[in-house]
């Protein structure tokens, strides 16, 4: 039995419910604990370690950059940063990129950019942004307000003004929420923390049409879905819908902290010197890591592999549901952003899987996320499903014993 505790880290602010597990190194899809036990990592640092642990390309890039330059500030030119920005623009709708350090920071910048867009066009009254129930956009004050979840907002004073939350997937509710102060719409193509809930292509297309009709900006939060997680570089590319603004982070650096805001020239109108900034954003180490990630992901066949592993994992998980319907009931998600709807409390399933040395992460709607590195092999998929089978069997056995007692 694994206990959630903070006793091993008495001087760390106790805001995380940490398990008593500690890891000393990682190899590909595996984490090696301090006692030598090997765990199959299907958390990927919550969709961060897209290339697994200690990927040779990332190690090489960071080792080489570490001997050259770590930090110089954004007062000077950054050739490698410009290279990364150009590559991201070439692969997307964007004309401009701003680099920062995290997903929440990227979303803060998106919110500022959406508001400033209308200010620059003579409409400072347009500052409100429509968001969706079940969303998660970060833990800063602005992104908490955009998220709108009471459990995250409690204790931090009045929520920041400027966000109108509507039911997910309800286009009529979106239409009713649009007013003279509305500046844009912010949505995750797939809600990760919210329970791996996908926005349908039809819904995203309807949002795009509304934004075009009303002069709003459409912003996609691709912090979790971006950088290959759904089987393409960006999740929205598989829907046929193009945003005006997008946030990236998590897998962009493959484990090294970096975030980004991508925007069209029109969306970024008015964003000149002094309108935004970051001390560490786009530092050379982070840029080197992100360029190395793109080097790997843009090789022919990379996303085909993700899609192939996705299909295999979904098929195997469906067969587990057939045999253990008392524990799990549904598979959802795209690419290797997979959610399993649990019948038992999701925390119990996460714990049972951890006891089988398979690491997963919970989400809303009683869902357990399977987020393997995108380099996962067929053998590792098979291995993970075997561990899930054993975890489900253990839970079923425990339920039977409780019922008999």
Swiss-Prot record:
It comes from the Bacteria. Signal peptide: none annotated. Pathway: Amino-acid biosynthesis; L-arginine biosynthesis; N(2)-acetyl-L-ornithine from L-glutamate: step 4/4. The keyword Cytoplasm applies. Keywords: Amino-acid biosynthesis, Aminotransferase, Arginine biosynthesis, Cytoplasm, Pyridoxal phosphate, Transferase. Homodimer. PANTHER family: AMINOTRANSFERASE CLASS III, SUCCINYLORNITHINE TRANSAMINASE. This is Acetylornithine aminotransferase 1. It comes from Bradyrhizobium diazoefficiens (strain JCM 10833 / BCRC 13528 / IAM 13628 / NBRC 14792 / USDA 110).
